[in-house]
Amino acid sequence: MKIENIKFKAENLNSGKWIEGDLIRKSNGIYIRRHKYLSAIVDASTVCIFTGLTDKNGTPIYEGDIVIYRDNNAERRGSINWDSKAAAFYFGQDFLVHYPSENMVVVGNEFDI
């Protein structure tokens, strides 16, 4: 993943909406910066990192997202997780790279269930 593709999303503490951007840690909390001078404090427990992939609709796929994967009449639903020991994203129990993202659709995330 290129450095310019490293981005995060988290739930804005004030509005409850999800925002994307750069992650900033300050003494008074965690922030997402969307623009050079515009940042918002976020719920640190909801911070998710971008996988570098998009689904078939062009929606960015983040850690914690719930996706539906369809291939050859089979459908599988699962969440995207990070395994620090393998340094890889997982879909269910398998490496994410084994599943073409153009066969996936983001349907939500584990924090909104």
Annotate each language-model stretch with its function:
Residues 1-113:
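Secondary-structure transition motif
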